[in-house]
């Protein structure tokens, strides 16, 4: 992640930073978008719904590009078993991607720890940021090994567990609660290799939401039903037990 001009520009108000983030999103300049929202978060210490979503979208795209790149490079490294030169190049490139991914994830985790979680209120905001914390520790776990992996896996589990407890105060159809269940179930499937627990969690969230679908508010109907579809898609994928190597589960 290169140093963005946003971090170097002086005299930018919070309003300016939000405007820059929106422009950067439209231009698909997600590094600039993330830089703007990082600076906004550090200046304000608290985010409204709009700013919260801008931060989430920015970093999801920034880290998502590195996660995808890592998978491709790691796959190439595994295939180059009979070519030492190609394998070495792929290994060096993978390590570079891992460093970038670690830097981005730790940047987000620092924002959460220092600014966002201490100021999180009400319940939906607390769940949102705890889920985000679980997500970014999960992304670290995808590339970590040995003791480092054990540590970030536990931290991801702890954050998701705290988020799940806090989410009990939200309706079962709330998109943040559903998104948490979706990502937590992916954690069990991909990181813990516990397909039974993943399916149990996803099915419980889906069934509970279906039971209260008639109470779903119009403003969240689209988001909630989309996540419910992702839950169902993952359940179908996992239940079939025929996932091709390289397939990636849906998360929010």
UniProtKB/Swiss-Prot annotation:
Gene3D superfamilies: 14-3-3 domain (1.20.190.20). InterPro entries: 14-3-3, 14-3-3_CS, 14-3-3_dom_sf, 14-3-3_domain. It holds the Pfam family 14-3-3. It comes from the Eukaryota. Belongs to the 14-3-3 family. PANTHER family: 14-3-3 PROTEIN. This is 14-3-3 protein homolog 1. It comes from Schistosoma mansoni (Blood fluke).
């Amino acid at each position: 992640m290169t140093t963005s001009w946003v971090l170097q520009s002086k005299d930018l108000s919070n309003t300016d930073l939000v405007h820059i983030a929106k422009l950067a999103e439209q231009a698909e300049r997600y590094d600039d978008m993330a830089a703007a929202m990082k600076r906004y978060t550090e200046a304000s210490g608290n985010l409204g719904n709009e700013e919260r979503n801008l931060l989430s979208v920015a970093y999801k795209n920034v880290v998502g590009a590195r996660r995808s790149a890592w998978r491709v490079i790691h796959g190439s490294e595994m295939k180059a078993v009979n070519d030492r030169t190609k394998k070495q190049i792929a290994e060096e490139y993978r390590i570079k991607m891992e460093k970038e991914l670690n830097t981005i994830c730790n940047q987000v985790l620092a924002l959460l720890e220092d600014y966002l979680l201490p100021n999180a209120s009400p319940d939906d905001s607390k769940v949102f940021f705890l889920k985000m914390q679980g997500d970014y520790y999960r992304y670290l776990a995808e590339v970590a090994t040995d003791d480092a992996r054990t540590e970030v896996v536990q931290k991801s589990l702890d954050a998701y567990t705290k988020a799940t407890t806090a989410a009990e105060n939200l309706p079962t159809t709330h998109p943040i609660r559903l998104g948490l269940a979706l990502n937590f179930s992916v954690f069990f499937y991909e990181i813990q290799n516990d397909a039974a627990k993943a399916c149990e969690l996803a099915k419980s969230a889906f069934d509970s939401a279906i039971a209260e679908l008639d109470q779903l508010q119009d403003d969240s109907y689209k988001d909630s039903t989309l996540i419910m579809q992702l839950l169902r898609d993952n359940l179908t994928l996992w239940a079939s037990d025929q996932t091709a190597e390289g397939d990636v589960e849906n998360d929010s």
